[in-house]
Amino acid sequence: MYSFRRLALLLALSLPAMTVALAQSSSSSSNPAAPAQAQQPAGQSQGQISVQARIKARREQRRSAAIHEAYNHLYEAYVSGGYLRFQPGPGVPAMGSAPAGPALQRANIYAWDTGLTRFYSERLGVTVDGRGYFATAYVYNNQYNITNPAISEYAGLIGPTYRFYMQPKYSVSGRVMGGFIHGKFSGDLGSFKPAQFGLWPDGNTFAASVSIPVEYNLTPNIGVRVVPEYFLSGFGSTTQNSLGFTLGVSYRFGQQ
């Protein structure tokens, strides 16, 4: 009986110690799971970033390939129609006791324009351009009964072209050209002189053009282009500053 009491006393004293030990063991076994759970969202986030980076890289590769396909051509030919506001002459000068006539109004000139660009890279090329301008110039009422004579001009230009913005479907370029222009202002005047009507004299002079060609690609080889332009000419030992545009189609061919 005495032994049984001693055994019961030992069990009663050891029970709290066993409870504490089990609690500590449970706590230590559960702690490593917390970092593992914390690391799992970080791993998922890095995986999502990696997938997005791959998608972005593939998209950029496709874009670069499309740009290369559209602009890696050796030549680009174009044909356009155009419009220009041009000063056809200074007006009738003073002669003897007769006063000078009024300055002539600007004429609405319609044009054809064709050219070829040889590219040395996807961006830089040299353009050779030929164009013709046609209009009637209003020279006011006069004693000759000629009020709207036909005038024409023909120009040849050359200069650099640079594509400063390229996308698979469109591009924007800058172009500067210089050359000569021939003016024919006496076509409808018979034996009269252009100066009698205030027009520029027939002849050749310098010409220059500054323009911004904008092209929209229908295919990698064919595009539609609009070209706003500043055009400078030098008839009559003066300068004519004209603004206009051309609208047409382009065809790219050959491989660099």
Per-region residue spans from a language model:
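Outer-membrane beta-barrel "beta-signal"
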Residues: N241-Q256
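Residues that define the transmembrane beta-barrel architecture of outer-membrane proteins
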Residues: H73, R106-W112, A150-G156, Y170, ...
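Outer-membrane beta-barrel translocator domains and adjoining extracellular loop/strand segments
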Residues: G89-A100, Y138-N145, F185-A195, G236-L243
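Residue-level signature of outer-membrane beta-barrel architecture
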Residues: G81-Y83, R118, Y162-F164, V214-Y216, ...
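Gram-negative (and chloroplast) outer-membrane scaffold detector with strong preference
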Residues: E76, T117-R118, E122-K193
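Repeated loop/turn-to-beta-strand initiation elements of outer-membrane beta-barrel proteins
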Residues: R123-V128, Q167-Y170, Y216-V224, Q255-Q256
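Transmembrane beta-strands of outer-membrane beta-barrel pores
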Residues: G81-Q87, G130-T136, G178-K184, Y230-G234, ...
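Short glycine/proline- and aromatic-enriched beta-strand/turn motifs that initiate or cap beta-hairpins
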Residues: Q24-T117
